[in-house]
């Protein structure tokens, strides 16, 4: 038996921030990073909130939010006792807000509403039961999954993402594709998650190059924003796989941006997983659903078309090679493989990978990357 549930109310499109006008006479706590706290976007958010609200801001969020950041946030939440928490920013801010609210509730601190407002189009965190918290001392990222992590409300306003730089647009867009593809070949995939994943990927292949080159196009940004959420809904239900299990280690140990790490792994992982007959057929079906090959193409031709189009998409987005992305980390690569293998094997996202991966298979995959 498989289950499927949507627990977050969505508001999308230009002007969707206006839904916040319903919040009156509340203590609203905004969780974001320091850059956003000083940017015009925070004023745009403030302007959307009625003047009778009391607003507090927690802006100590860094990329890959840490355990310490979450602990600080819980302490502030205990002190402030807000009515509403708004996670505002990229995946790091949304993950931190969700984790802070979740852990605070376990201490008996309740809020009326948790709102997620993404300012990048990538993680899908606004509609998932997942968050990722880092331990910089150990170089490990911990993905957490719990239905209590779903935000109550998500707002997808494309005007909040038009200023995202091309490189970040590319990285986060490839994260969307990875979410869709891993959900599609997951052992927990269903007709419902397939539909979400297919639509998300179709949008990425069509609109991501335009979003990277013409970031001020609201229609394109809106499409990518929706794709991110569609893929988030897909993987939140179906799970992920070895791509994310390894990407978490590349982020934790080499500080590669998460979306970039996923993008650089993607075709290697497809080759790895396609040795499983079921996964190979699913990849072929995915390629046909995204119109990357003729409908009558055989599975091998469809699989090759998928790999070819992903490599083309990476080129269109001007992504670096794996070696260039690692920079000085290349010297430490070989010696860190054993620890990355062990951490990836323990990563919860590996549980729904279509091909079973043991330590030797994982090591072989990592060794071929560089």
Curated annotation (Swiss-Prot):
Belongs to the iron-containing alcohol dehydrogenase family. Pathway: Polyol metabolism; 1,2-propanediol degradation. The keyword Oxidoreductase applies. Interacts with PduP, probably via the N-terminus of PduQ. GO terms for cellular component: bacterial microcompartment. Its cofactor is Fe cation. It holds the Pfam family Fe-ADH. It is found in: Bacterial microcompartment. It catalyses: 1-propanol + NAD(+) = propanal + NADH + H(+). This is 1-propanol dehydrogenase PduQ. Transmembrane segments: none annotated. Keywords: Bacterial microcompartment, Iron, NAD, Oxidoreductase. The lineage of its organism: Bacteria, Pseudomonadati, Pseudomonadota, Gammaproteobacteria, Enterobacterales. Gene3D superfamilies: 3.40.50.1970, Dehydroquinate synthase-like - alpha domain. The keyword NAD applies. One of its GO terms (molecular function) is alcohol dehydrogenase (NAD+) activity. An iron-dependent alcohol dehydrogenase required for optimal 1,2-propanediol (1,2-PD) degradation. NAD(+) and NADH are regenerated internally within the bacterial microcompartment (BMC) dedicated to 1,2-PD degradation by the PduP and PduQ enzymes, which reduce NAD(+) and oxidize NADH respectively, although there must also be cofactor transport across the BMC. Expression of a cosmid containing the full 21-gene pdu operon in E.coli allows E.coli to grow on 1,2-propanediol (1,2-PD) with the appearance of bacterial microcompartments (BMC) in its cytoplasm. One of its GO terms (biological process) is propanediol catabolic process. Its EC number is 1.1.-.-.
